[in-house]
From Swiss-Prot:
Protein location: Cytoplasm
Protein name: Proteasome subunit alpha
Job description of the protein: Component of the proteasome core, a large protease complex with broad specificity involved in protein degradation.
MF (Gene Ontology): threonine-type endopeptidase activity
Gene source species: Salinispora arenicola (strain CNS-205)
Keywords: Cytoplasm, Proteasome
Disordered: annotated span: 231-273
Activation and inhibition: The formation of the proteasomal ATPase ARC-20S proteasome complex, likely via the docking of the C-termini of ARC into the intersubunit pockets in the alpha-rings, may trigger opening of the gate for substrate entry. Interconversion between the open-gate and close-gate conformations leads to a dynamic regulation of the 20S proteasome proteolysis activity.
InterPro entries to which the protein is assigned, alphabetical: Ntn_hydrolases_N (IPR029055), Proteasome_alpha (IPR050115), Proteasome_alpha-type (IPR023332), Proteasome_asu_bac (IPR022296), Proteasome_sua/b (IPR001353)
Gene that this sequence comes from: prcA
Coiled-coil features, chain-numbered ranges: none
Length: 273
């Protein structure tokens, strides 16, 4: 009869943690931070079809690193939960904290009960009336939840990126300055010999939760609008309304369709596909 090997619970948990950390470290990093106009998401993403940043509800956004199929399943479950609670009770009852707790319970159960943990790290962000009211929650593969102070980085080199963010981030920054700080932080790691990298616009996925919008606040920043934000000549200046949105009046209107709320680019009237 074959002898069965014994592994202590501590060793099993260490092995699962190591597996999850290695999987997360293989992916590209993402940054989430508060700025004067809302909450900014910036992720390195070479794919135009698979999004690492997305919308969950009116004032709640989602960003993740790791295995796409795993964190996308979590995001979809969060959308269904938020929609159900909003329809059953009130839209104001849907909060980022409640969603973060639900994600934490799911991740914790998978980590302890399944043979393989999810190789993901997640941020749930909720935009508030002011930067002090913004909420950023970090969730790790084992279900741990941390409330982050207005800025956070995810991925294998999150500690080094967070150090750059801590040095340069200010809550009163314009959108243009916030994008530059986020891209600078992402590019500070991964270069040859420890040198900084230059990240092109087509390698970035950028989105915001716009504090000034009513209803759905999530919108993507793409194309010419993103190029303007990354342009060195526009340093220290917020993007013009023609580049970032149709008009200030349009920004104050409630958004009812995914096309009007989800995409920002050179042709705002075109629905997001």
């Amino acid at each position: 009869m074959a002898m069965q090997f014994y592994a202590s619970p501590e060793q099993i948990m260490r092995d699962r943690s190591e597996l999850a950390r290695k999987g997360i470290a293989r992916g590209r990093s993402a940054v989430v931070l508060s700025y004067a106009g809302g909450v900014l998401f910036v992720a390195e993403n070479l794919s135009s079809a698979l999004h690492k940043v997305g919308e969950i509800y009116d004032r709640i956004g989602f960003a993740a690193v790791g295995r796409y199929n795993e964190f996308e399943n979590l995001r979809r479950a969060g959308v269904r939960m938020a929609d159900l609670n909003g329809l059953s009770y009130d839209r104001r009852d849907v909060t980022g904290r409640a969603l973060a707790n639900a994600f934490a319970q799911t991740l914790g159960a998978i980590f302890t009960e399944q043979s393989k943990p999810f190789e993901v790290e997640i941020c749930v962000a909720q935009v508030g009336a002011t930067t002090a009211d913004d909420e950023l929650y970090r969730l790790t593969y084992d279900g741990s939840v941390n409330d982050e102070p207005g800025r956070m980085a995810m991925g294998g080199q999150a500690e080094a990126i967070t150090g750059v963010l801590k040095s340069n981030h200010r809550p009163d920054m314009s959108l243009g300055d916030a994008v530059k700080v986020a891209v600078q932080a992402l590019g500070s790691v991964g270069g040859e010999g420890g040198a900084a990298r230059t990240i092109a616009a087509d390698q970035l996925e950028v989105a915001v939760l716009d504090r000034g919008r009513v209803g759905r606040t999530f919108r993507r920043v793409t194309g010419a609008a993103l190029t303007v934000l990354l342009d060195d000549g526009a340093a220290g200046q917020p993007p013009s309304s023609s580049d970032t949105d149709t008009s200030a009046a349009e920004a104050r209107k409630p958004t009812a369709s995914a096309g009007s709320a989800d995409l920002e680019g050179p042709e705002p009237e075109r629905p997001d596909s």
